[in-house]
Curated annotation (Swiss-Prot):
Protein's organism: Aspergillus niger (strain ATCC MYA-4892 / CBS 513.88 / FGSC A1513)
EC number in record: 3.4.22.-
Region feature (Disordered): 1-100
Gene Ontology biological process terms in this record: apoptotic process; proteolysis
Chain's gene name: casA
Low complexity bias locations: 24-51
Protein name: Metacaspase-1A
GO cellular component terms listed in the entry, alphabetical order: cytoplasm
EC class name: hydrolase
Length: 404
């Protein structure tokens, strides 16, 4: 969204969640000390008693999820527990992209049994033109949800919001880029990484010819007027490109023009695939034998769903080929966005609290049914949104996502 226009969202005055020592670079002076993460999320709008020390956590080893409801992995899922109408676990071996990808180029599903790390960014742009109201609430809600439902420990989350006193916790361009590097640092196969951005988004003319619409997607740090925006190409280079096969990165963008913020080559709508490399042709040839029917790791168990295919009109095959060559990834990257690139994200007043519509719908849909496929979840999010808004959710992926 153009940062000069007001867009969603009542401000929330809470503080950030504490982290452990940030190993790469300590802030110059650190008046805050924090040892153990609080076992329960704080309630209401009061910040926690312990100050956030601005340090980024070193992710702990993944907890054991056996017998815990709502957390499926390749070993503990409804299929293995006797429900054979549920999807089978994902293949653990590398899987081919199929036509349109470089020769011998594979991706690998994450078993999501390893470390869990999350980076959550919420920017209300206090005292700036175009101030927003609900972005910090989005982050507060998402962090609580990840902690209570998906086993993300508070000490393995970095929260950047512009209501925090510590300068290291402000969502400045430098802090956001540093935190993006932290998120993917030392990621190993079967780790689960989560990225959430709620704030202003926008578009800028595409300089390298890789976007269908001629524009790159951008996000606006709190200091964008001085430091500039962050382009999708840079987010892809930092957070997607370095990932090893078998690492899961889930990203949610609740901002205007966020439909392709991570620059991933496969884009899904509730009707089917919007952008894909020759997959429609492969479907006709019966080559879509690889099924990403995945016991859902972070998000939801894949269940049988038919996906319709159609091609998005692009500005030319050259841009298309360039994207496929440079933006596919051997990792397992999934992105949810609150608006397609030609839409704007909506304001929301849910139960008297200002929130981003996408963030709210994502959590609401999963609360109602945690065992959903990606495509079902996309439709559930659409249903949640359609009751109140015109906004259409979108799902992007670094690899073919097909549930048969």
């Amino acid at each position: 969204m153009n940062p000069h226009h007001s867009h969603h969202h009542s401000s929330y005055g809470g503080g950030g969640y504490p982290g452990q020592a940030y190993r790469q670079q300590q802030p110059p002076s650190n008046p805050y000390q924090y040892n153990q993460p609080s076992p329960q999320p704080y309630q209401g709008s009061q910040p926690p008693q312990n100050g956030y020390n601005g340090g980024y956590p070193a992710a702990s080893q993944g907890p054991m999820y056996g017998g815990r409801p709502g957390i499926a992995d390749v070993y503990h899922n409804s299929y293995n527990q006797g429900n054979h109408s549920a999807p089978a676990p994902p293949p653990s071996d590398p899987v081919s992209f199929g036509q349109g990808a470089p020769q011998g180029y594979n991706f690998q599903y994450s078993r999501c049994t390893g470390k869990r790390k999350a980076l959550l960014i919420g920017i209300n742009y206090f005292n700036q033109k175009g101030q927003l109201r609900g972005c910090i609430n989005d982050v507060k809600n998402m962090s609580t949800y990840l902690n209570q439902n998906f086993g993300y420990a508070r000490e393995d989350m970095v929260v950047l919001t512009d209501d925090q006193q510590n300068p290291m916790s402000q969502p400045t361009k430098a802090n956001i880029l540093r935190a993006m590097h932290w998120l993917v640092k030392d990621a190993q196969p079967n780790d689960s990484l989560f990225f959430h951005y709620s704030g202003h988004g926008g578009q800028t003319p595409d300089l390298d010819g890789d976007e269908d619409d001629g524009y790159d997607e951008v996000i606006y740090p709190v200091d964008f007027r001085a430091a500039g925006h962050i382009v999708d190409d840079e987010m892809h280079r930092i957070m997607v490109k370095p990932l090893q096969p078998g690492v899961r990165l889930t990203a949610i963008f609740d901002s205007c023009h966020s439909g392709s913020a991570l620059d991933l080559p496969y884009i899904y709508s509730t009707q089917g695939i919007l952008k894909e490399p020759n997959l429609a042709k492969e479907a006709g040839q019966g080559l879509l034998g690889v099924v990403s029917a995945y016991a859902r790791g972070d998000m939801s168990s894949m269940m049988s769903t038919a996906v319709g295919f159609f091609k998005k009109a692009t500005k030319g095959d050259e841009a298309y080929e360039r994207t496929i060559q440079t933006k596919t990834s051997p990792a397992d990257v999934v992105m949810w966005s609150g608006s397609k690139d030609d839409q704007t994200s909506q304001d929301a007043q849910i139960a008297g609290q200002a929130t981003g519509a996408m963030s709210w719908a994502f959590i609401s849909a999963l609360r109602k049914n945690p065992q959903q496929s990606y495509v079902q979840l996309l439709n559930s999010i659409r249903d949640e949104l359609s009751a109140k808004y015109t906004q259409k959710p979108q799902l992007s992926c670094s690899h073919p996502l097909v549930a048969l």
